[in-house]
Regions:
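An interfacial alpha-helical scaffold signature
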Residues: 1-243
Length: 243
């Protein structure tokens, strides 16, 4: 039997219960040295179906107000018998990562290109110069970073994405400062030319959790190690630029 990891947390309230669901695997807790792994028992690495992904996100989101939560992307699996030893082996890295996100949430600000519906010869002033290029998007991202008032951020270009998605900036924001953060970036949103600035969140700090390949995942003596969905493919890497 294996365990599919949702998150590792500190200070999990005794009254916490996973969100109810009519179907899907049960949720189990494994406590080791002050850390709690939130998992589900599985017989194999789960397929990334829409219901499975939605259930994963719902469970992780239910941990948003825990003191410190280290969320994992879908598909991280360890052998259940090895889970306590795996946590113990990686406790220093896990605690360091939890310390970096303690009391914080992720706010993701999406930058969307705006396209006017005018005829070719009647372009409006806002889009007369064409849609913003990569430098223009990054300039808006830089203004957001300057105004955000937070120390940690990650900028990501959405090159090749469908639709008008162009870029995004993830910010690690203290939970109590979300409203102030939104107020600080509002002037940037109102002045952006040809770009819609769309804040989303708060979310669990996925963008600030270390990717699987950044944790020391080589199995220690006697441990079964870790694998991920997709034939061992690593979890998504952090965004291109980091504050």
């Amino acid at each position: 039997m294996d365990s599919h990891l949702y998150a590792i947390v500190e200070e999990l309230p005794p009254a916490w219960r996973p969100p109810s669901a009519p179907s899907g695997p049960s949720v189990a807790l494994t406590r080791v040295a002050g850390l709690t792994a939130v998992t589900s028992p599985v017989e194999r690495t789960p397929a990334a179906s829409a219901p499975a992904l939605a259930r994963h996100d719902t469970i992780v989101a239910s941990l948003l107000h825990v003191g410190a939560v280290l969320p994992f992307r879908f598909g991280l699996v360890v052998a259940t018998a090895d889970l306590p030893g795996w946590i113990a082996a990686h406790a220093p890295s896990l605690r360091a990562s939890l310390g970096q996100v303690r009391g914080c949430v992720e706010m993701d600000v999406r930058l969307l290109r705006l396209h006017c519906a005018h005829a070719v010869g009647l372009a409006c002033p806002a889009c007369a110069g064409g849609t913003p290029d990569a430098d223009g998007l990054r300039a808006v991202g830089d203004r957001l970073i300057e105004q955000a008032g937070v120390a940690r951020w990650r900028y990501r270009s959405a090159a090749g994405a469908q639709g008008n998605a162009a870029a995004s900036v993830a910010f690690l924001v203290p939970r109590r400062e979300v409203a102030a953060f939104l107020s600080r970036i509002a002037p940037v949103a109102s002045r952006a030319q040809g770009i819609a600035v769309v804040p989303t969140g708060p979310w669990p700090p996925y963008s600030f959790a270390p990717p699987v390949d950044r944790l020391p995942l080589a199995p220690a003596a006697g441990l079964g190690g870790v694998r991920t969905a997709g034939g061992g493919a690593p979890a998504p890497r952090p965004r291109a630029a980091d504050g």
